[in-house]
């Protein structure tokens, strides 16, 4: 766009004709008109709507989780100290795109983890968790997506990931980051959140209830790319002012995510190992998560174990002091990582324990047995991009030899 001409000054300005009537004041720019987004519950038997028949589903609700996805493999897999870890625990944009297409093609539809179980009371008036009957489009299967560490940690900023989520001029969620040449990039094709948003816009039947995914947040380097965290070692008024500014900046992002089917869960404040931490440490960490993260995203009943490490009581019939404390703080669904979408309702306390499957480098490179755990979702041999990943080999049998 051409710049505005400079204002006239001196004699030239005095010769400018004055209009008979004052110009109309400039109008304020209009806020972007957001498309309405409908979120509904799959626990309601809606019968047949618009030619789609909804039928009860009491089987397994599958659950896949992802870490942040690699936008620029040339930065992620550059041979530095982080490269192998990224190769183990992440997928690339291209791999993520293919996974979304595969689960869609295989008849999965997204549901919100918060709709799968509910808190109720038993015949003695004691609180218990119950598994809800879901009503799913006939021929479809329910699927939960969750995303760990959607914080945009400092170390990731130079290793091929996007930097933060932002609101675009259209009112939608976009990602912001720098490409390998250092150019600013605002995109909806480089981040797991925005890619799924776009996929659902293009395939609305993938999310018949409006659900997207559950964002599992720590707090030690802020959330969603905004440095909303405190530091107990070095702090001053300037740092606090910047933190408050970041808190205000992230609020509209949170609101838009919630409006469009995203929910939030805790990944602990400090990504602590709940299997080896003391009760005092868990208490301090949980309070800090509630103060710095929960105060922004709102209450949640979902706890995603860092490292998949299970605290005491992560079995059906016994509960230790750490698990009991976490349940007393409002957590009801406790999610680890495993080889299937296992879930059990605990009998001694009002809680659910469950596992999630993890599409990542370790499972995409895994043995025939490992990739078999994922075969209902995709064929790992079709997903993995060995052209951009480090040359670390695979354990599965090639298709031509299988």
Stretches with model-predicted labels:
Residues 3, 9-14, 18, 22, ...:
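Generic signature of intrinsically disordered, low-complexity, basic-rich segments
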Residues 122-126:
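Extracellular/surface-associated beta-sandwich interaction domains
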Residues 64-76, 128-129, 136-143, 150-311, ...:
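Metal-dependent polysaccharide deacetylase catalytic core of the NodB/CE4 family, i.e.
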Residues 31-116, 129-145, 153-157, 275-402:
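C-terminal active-site subregion of NodB/CE4 polysaccharide deacetylases
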Residues 1-49:
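Intrinsically disordered, low-complexity repeat and linker tracts
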Residues 118-120:
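Short amphipathic alpha-helical segments embedded in low-complexity Lys/Glu-rich regions
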Residues 16, 21-25, 29, 253, ...:
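Generic detector of bulky aromatic hydrophobic side chains
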